[in-house]
């Protein structure tokens, strides 16, 4: 009898494990977590269009990611770019988003989250950012 609640708890824990923020450098099949923290998520909504900016910082390292969403069921990621400095190196490129979340209506404070892949000049994914649904403040 005690096994059923234990199994349920384990399944619940595993199912919620990916709901944490993480900024990773992709090194081939390996990913290395970097200490950059989400410093702010700002944006505007105009009808079905959302433009947002996320800022990440850690000491001298900083990165800004700009994304555009279109709110149809389900929400669509339209485009994104990033630029910043990591490890003393200037970086910039395109953003891809295989998974996006958007919650909130016209009058509610919207929340945005998802998995964002930052690409280099050769269109290779070099960074992955996992963001749980995070309230977006107005610019």
Q: Each predicted region: which residue ranges?
A:
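Sec-dependent signal peptide recognition
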Residues: 1-7
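C-terminal motif of bacterial Sec signal peptides marking the signal peptidase cleavage site
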Residues: 12-15
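Central antiparallel beta-sheet cores of small beta-barrel/beta-sandwich binding domains
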Residues: 19-108, 113-134
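Short, solvent-exposed mixed-charge patches
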Residues: 137-139
């Amino acid at each position: 009898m005690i096994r059923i609640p234990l199994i349920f708890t384990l399944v619940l824990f595993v199912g919620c494990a990916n709901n944490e923020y993480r900024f990773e450098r992709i090194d081939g099949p390996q990913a290395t977590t970097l200490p950059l923290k989400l410093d702010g998520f700002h944006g505007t909504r105009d009808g079905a269009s959302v433009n947002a900016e996320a800022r990440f910082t850690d000491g001298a390292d900083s990165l800004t990611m700009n994304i555009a969403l279109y709110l149809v069921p389900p929400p669509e990621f339209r485009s994104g770019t990033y630029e910043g400095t990591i490890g003393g190196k200037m970086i910039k490129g395109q953003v891809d988003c295989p998974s996006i979340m958007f919650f909130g209506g016209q009058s509610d404070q919207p929340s945005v989250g998802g998995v964002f892949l930052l690409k280099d000049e050769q269109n290779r994914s070099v960074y992955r950012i996992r963001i749980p649904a995070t309230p977006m403040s107005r610019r």
